Amino acid sequence: MSGTHKKLGARHKARKRAVDFLFEAEARDLDPVDLATERAELSGKDDSVAPVAPYTVTVVTGVAENLDRLDEVISSHLQDWTLERLPAVDRAILRIAVWELFHATDVPPVVAVDEAVELAKQLSTDESPGFVNGILGQVVLVAPQVRSAAAATSRRAETADGESNDARS
């Protein structure tokens, strides 16, 4: 990135808002999906509340639904650290990026990593961008296999649903 400010796209802003919601939910011991949904509803009624992009809700929901697996993957790539020791904002950034790497098929892996590093630069410590990049550099190597397995599982579930619907007919 050059010395000029990079124009931030809608997805970047949505990811940043997702980090905010995940961070706030963890700090306040709230359900992140409820928090994002309530803010989205409130923003429709109150102009003083910033709008919540649909992608923000998608990301927060995806992270919440897959939290245990995401944390397991992140933890497996930490060396001499535990997930709990990471700054909360770094946890939120990593969770979003790993969710995108594994589940957001419309997001190229390089974009998920670059966005996470950019968010770490904006929101966290001086060491965080390199740390986030290092962890995601390892995770990105297994992402294609995880995506393939998820797609196969989804296809099997759809086939099973179709067969059970046929049996009821």
Curated annotation (Swiss-Prot):
Keywords associated with the record: RNA-binding, Transcription, Transcription antitermination, Transcription regulation
Q: Entry's InterPro entries?
A: NusB-like_sf, NusB_fam, NusB_RsmB_TIM44
Q: Name one GO cellular component term.
A: cytosol
Q: Which Pfam families match?
A: NusB (PF01029)
Which GO BP terms, alphabetically? DNA-templated transcription termination; transcription antitermination
Disulfide bond positions: none
Q: Which GO terms describe its molecular function?
A: RNA binding
Q: What does this protein do?
A: Involved in transcription antitermination. Required for transcription of ribosomal RNA (rRNA) genes. Binds specifically to the boxA antiterminator sequence of the ribosomal RNA (rrn) operons.
Report the sequence similarity comment from the record: Belongs to the NusB family.
Protein name per its UniProtKB record: Transcription antitermination protein NusB
Q: Which organism is it from?
A: Rhodococcus opacus (strain B4)
